[in-house]
């Protein structure tokens, strides 16, 4: 009696585990476009590398890894990871020397922060926290961070000017000199906490 193997492509993670597990060599690989990587150069000379998954692709991790191939070992590279603790976050955090967790002082924000911290502790990563929209919630998140000894790198207040400038596609640091100083100071704090790594990303 013939036996058939059905591969559910929509659920495929492209890990190759089924290929290795099938002792009859009944499964073969094929090329598939998972996404695209685009590279942009800013007037300042900095590069932006964007990885964009194709519609319907279950796991964006291969696209993230593809984008990472275009980073340079010299200088500093910033990885922008998605929220949550799913595979894309882990794939991004795993290659970073230091992680900046952005949260909000709300019960929901604290819950997500605890999950992220637990994940990063498992990965043995160094990290600090930036509190966005500070002043809107209670003190629970501050008390928890103090209890855990986790550094607060900066607090960004709830500011309508930030929302307005962002909605116009501009950077608040380019419009408001005060925020330029704010983010410059944040950068210095991150460098101080990250230490002198041989390859800072």
Residue ranges and their predicted role:
Residues 1-7, 17-33:
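Iron-sulfur cluster-binding cysteine motifs and their immediate structural context
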Residues 33-44, 201:
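Long, charged amphipathic helices and adjacent flexible linkers at domain junctions
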Residues 50-55, 64-89:
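Switch II (G3) loop of P-loop NTPases
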Residues 73, 96-100, 120-128:
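Short, surface-exposed connector motifs at secondary-structure boundaries
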Residues 79, 101, 129-131:
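Structural beta-sheet core signal
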Residues 86-107, 113:
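Inter-motif core of Ras-like GTPase G domains
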Residues 119-201:
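C-terminal lobe/tail of nucleotide-utilizing enzymes
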